[in-house]
Amino acid sequence: MPNSTPQSQLIRAHVFVTGRVQGVGFRYSTVDTASQLGLTGWVRNLPDGRVEAVFEGVRDIVEDMVRWCHAGPPAAVVQDVAVEYEEPEGLRGFEVKRLVK
């Protein structure tokens, strides 16, 4: 479980997904998949049509989630996934955040 893993072994991926990724269940599929993998973080729609997400957890599992983002749920058409790696913040749970205005 990520909560029992030393902080030094955790990573944080900040992801921006471009394509037909809004209105296709991308956020809720992200929550389901990330939660099943035991990751923490959040996901939200952006006004420019992209989806933004943050995943924190053990490196291999975070990388699995980033790979999942390249396909997303069945109705999504992903064109690009940009990933920035940052210092983990020790997030708890996984949630959908409100749209950024």
Curated annotation (Swiss-Prot):
Residues 12-98 form the Acylphosphatase-like domain. The active site is at 27, 45. GO terms for molecular function: acylphosphatase activity. It comes from the Bacteria. Keywords: Hydrolase. Pfam families: Acylphosphatase (PF00708). The keyword Hydrolase applies. Its EC number is 3.6.1.7. Transmembrane segments: none annotated. It catalyses: an acyl phosphate + H2O = a carboxylate + phosphate + H(+). It is an enzyme of class 3 (hydrolase). Belongs to the acylphosphatase family. This is Acylphosphatase.
